[in-house]
From Swiss-Prot:
It catalyses: UDP-N-acetyl-alpha-D-muramate + L-alanine + ATP = UDP-N-acetyl-alpha-D-muramoyl-L-alanine + ADP + phosphate + H(+). ATP binds at G122, T123, H124, G125, K126, T127, T128. Belongs to the MurCDEF family. Keywords: ATP-binding, Cell cycle, Cell division, Cell shape, Cell wall biogenesis/degradation, Cytoplasm, Ligase, Nucleotide-binding, Peptidoglycan synthesis. The gene is murC. This is UDP-N-acetylmuramate--L-alanine ligase. GO terms for molecular function: ATP binding; UDP-N-acetylmuramate-L-alanine ligase activity. GO terms for cellular component: cytoplasm. Cell wall formation. Pathway: Cell wall biogenesis; peptidoglycan biosynthesis. The keyword ATP-binding applies. NCBIfam families: murC.
Amino acid sequence: MIRRLQDSGDLVRAFPRVHFVGIGGTGMSGIAEVMLTLGYEVSGSDNADNAATRRLAKLGARVMRGHSAANVLGTDCVVVSSAIREDNPELMEARSQRIPIMPRAAMLAELMRFRRGIAVAGTHGKTTTTSLAAAVLSEGGLDPTFVIGGQLLAAGANAKLGGGQWLVAEADESDGSFLRLNPLMAVITNIDADHLENYGNDFARVQAAFAEFLQRLPFYGLALLCIDDPEVAALAGKTPRHVMSYGMSENADVRAEDVVQDGPRMRFTLRLPEGTTTPVTLALPGRHNVLNALAAAAIGWQLGVAPDTIARALENFAGIGRRFNDLGEVTTSSGARVRVVDDYGHHPRELEAVFAAARGGWPDKRLVVAFQPHRYSRTRDQFDAFAAVLSTVDALVLSEVYPAGEAPIPGADSRALARAIRARGRSEPVVVGQIAGLAEVLPDVLQDGDLLLMMGAGDIGYVAQHIISNGFVGEQA
């Protein structure tokens, strides 16, 4: 049947049913929640049940466990995650039924068409920067829509449909999908060698993709670039768009001065383009988070948020799930009292930044790291860098690599990484074959007063939550 748009009066009623394949993913669940709020009938499937799928179900989405061709029957559009294989039965059925199929980034681009888009790109820091920007705009009364790759703790969600005209979202460079977006404002936090498997193992193609991302801005758009990052700084001089820079460099348009760490917080003076200076206490540790906050401040300044309002938003920021998330203290069976911090960091540069933040905030504590490498390809490509940064901690426990769908690569597993770290002569890493064994092994490594960092982009976060809830007893995977 051919549906006439004028018969329904709006597009939601004309094409109300949207199905998400891989609805539990961080990027997918956020878009699904926004579309639910817009009035769409949302369904979705995923192989795993998680907090995101449970939240969506409570909000009214129909969520199915596992993938089946029957799940897409009657739907008007199928949204697919980049993690989904082409032979997925739901995609195959959608093709046979000629149901429109949209990649996740394409649907985000559709949402952005109805708002003024702010897209935050960069190899590291996207989630934190996007979250801080949403907090600044909210504090400034702009009521933004946001779609974030992590849970904004103050909102209890990774997405929200706001009543204002601005939409702030992460722009994912990992698979090149950020090139589908057409924002009014684009942020680049940094450019690093990661996800090279999607760029023909050629870093020059990564650099070119970021340059093309800025080309997608309209002629009146704005590029907000972190010139403390050499790759971004090089891009700034070649970008044929309006540019505002941020960083700690003296020539940055928006910069931080007199930066000091005070426990889990950072204190600095925010200097804005008009010459205005404002003292800021940022509710996050680490110099890398100061840079993330500067990007949010630059966005706020551009949209007319007052400097004291920007400072208040940064001071009251409640954090993001799995981004230096201080879970509290727990006691081992031997009586050792340790503080547990959960973090998503999974690239050597991210590990280095988090370690620096931990040492800056708790200089008297031993730094114990439980790390789950993410992807065999990343472990191979960054092998020496991983060995170098992981050899700097006081004690280390490695679980096996979280494959994320990849087949094992010889010489790119945790045991090979442990041997490389051991050869440096600074630490004696402990290796556990399965992530479920971490909780049992850690008490043998920990001492009273330690700071335990549990890091990785796989499922190590569930172990951290298990330890806080149940102590150091066996985790059931």
